[in-house]
Amino acid sequence: MRFDPARNSHSRLADGTPGRRRRYMKKILLVSFWLVLSIQASCSEEHRQPQSSDISLEGAGSLTIIFEDGADTGFSDDEKQLITDLVTHAEQDVRALLHTLPDAIEVTAIVIDRNVDIVGGVTGRADAPGKVLIEFSSAFPGGISAAAKGALSSTIFHEFHHLARGWTIQGNKFGAGIPIAAVNEGLATVFAEEYTGVYFEAAYSYPQNAAEWLQEILALPVDADYSTWMMGEHPDGRNSIGYRVGRYIVHQAIANSGKSILELSGLAPNEILRLAEKGSGKMVG
């Protein structure tokens, strides 16, 4: 229980027993209690300090992995080693493919308790240039290690694609609008899918009438609600519309232009949209 000054002060004042020795002993006990509390607080704060691994990689890149451990949730040593190995290997693979990847990258790993099984128990976001947050669900069947083995590499490929392209929450290089967001998320999704072989159908599949969804988002105002149209649930029951349409856009652009995902990754969103709408509009994937 946290020390409550009001409750303890009240108990001291309520004790009216005379005697200097009794008052002296109470002072000693109070000082001792404060010392114990101070030590506990110091240890607790030390336990919550994030632990980091600085990794110097062959070539131009450097990678820092930070594990944020709390008092109740965190990573075991084996989990940290597994995550470090997977992130390191994925970083090297992505860097060989995307030459605009920042030289220095910081990955922060945290444990969450919410269900993200739809993407294999691992999710993430590109917070700022060179900075990525990766969340591991402790609720995933098999735990953090199972989630990491099945989905971490795919998540790193996805989020590092955002870093290479400049699609970050802070320092974003792109304008507003759902079509732009859909293109950038679609590029990262297809990139990760092609190079890791991992595909989460429940999260990214698109329907046969995806072309209609594309026209729908193209007609949206630039300030359309991001959650409703990208990663949340639409009032009509559809979910993750922008992510699904984004994957469709990229598949269409590849089919119509013959360009690879790496070539498309160097193009502006409006150019990719133009390629996606070119030709007969046949469905791919």
PLM regions with names:
Residues 176-212:
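Post-HExxH zinc-binding segment in Zn-dependent metallohydrolases
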Residues 82-131:
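Auxiliary, metal-adjacent structural segments of Zn-dependent hydrolase domains
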Residues 39-42:
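C-terminal motif of bacterial Sec signal peptides marking the signal peptidase cleavage site
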Residues 44-46:
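Bacterial signal peptide processing site
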Residues 154-167:
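Active-site recognition of the HExxH zinc-binding catalytic motif
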Residues 59-78:
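Acidic/histidine-rich, surface-exposed loop or edge segments in extracytoplasmic proteins
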